[in-house]
Amino acid sequence: MMINTQEDKLVSAHDAEEFHRFFVGHDSDLQQEVTTLLTREADLLDIQAYKAWLEHCVAPEIKYQVISRELRSTSERRYQLNDAVNIYNENYQQLKVRVEHQMDPQNWYNSPKIRFTRFVTNVTAAKDKSAPEMLHVRSNLILHRARRGNQVDVFYATREDKWKRIEGGGIKLVERFVDYPERSPQTHNLMIFL
């Protein structure tokens, strides 16, 4: 099944290519394996086991990027600005600094403790044709963050990941590209891992 972007003008070439990759390369066993993997990752992040997440899920060569795209219509644009801005553009060391900041007892952000609930949906997975140890994974994420009785935030995002099979049978995240749909976040902060 192919998407004709000339006829379906609202579909970007990138989205059409990704849809084709997952539609053609569908593998039920791989789908189940990746769904289980993402569920375990979400559980680690929900219970705030950030060091375990870094150790067991994240590869040292990670590229972790969260962007926000321009959501205004073309007629509303006055200037030729970039369509996307980085919210986060991090490597392993930068993620490690964020994790250590979360562990700091002086960090007011964790008092009272925050509760997270992640819903990972619409998971699709495909093996890379040129590098069979590499997996392409696309998913949607809903993240609920609650702190105190009246401070609740909900985040929605689409994630495009690359996971790599490593020696010893594990799988680690080497690239995460998160498309966060709010240009100006309506939350208190984005001190979260998506």
UniProtKB/Swiss-Prot annotation:
GO terms for molecular function: dioxygenase activity. InterPro entries: NTF2-like_dom_sf, Rng_hydr_dOase-bsu. It comes from the Bacteria. CDD domains: ring_hydroxylating_dioxygenases_beta. The keyword tRNA-binding does not apply. Belongs to the bacterial ring-hydroxylating dioxygenase beta subunit family. Component of the 2,4-dinitrotoluene dioxygenase (DNTDO) multicomponent enzyme system which catalyzes the incorporation of both atoms of molecular oxygen into 2,4-dinitrotoluene (DNT) to form 4-methyl-5-nitrocatechol (MNC) and nitrite. The beta subunit seems to have a structural role in the holoenzyme. Also able to convert naphthalene to cis-(1R,2S)-dihydroxy-1,2-dihydronaphthalene. GO terms for biological process: 3-phenylpropionate catabolic process. The 2,4-dinitrotoluene dioxygenase (DNTDO) multicomponent enzyme system is composed of an electron transfer component and a dioxygenase component (iron sulfur protein (ISP)). The electron transfer component is composed of a ferredoxin reductase (DntAa) and a ferredoxin (DntAb), and the dioxygenase component is formed of a large alpha subunit (DntAc) and a small beta subunit (DntAd). The lineage of its organism: Bacteria, Pseudomonadati, Pseudomonadota, Betaproteobacteria, Burkholderiales. The keyword Oxidoreductase applies. It comes from Burkholderia sp. (strain RASC). Keywords: Aromatic hydrocarbons catabolism, Dioxygenase, Oxidoreductase. The gene is dntAd. This is 2,4-dinitrotoluene dioxygenase system, small oxygenase component. Disulfide bonds: none annotated.
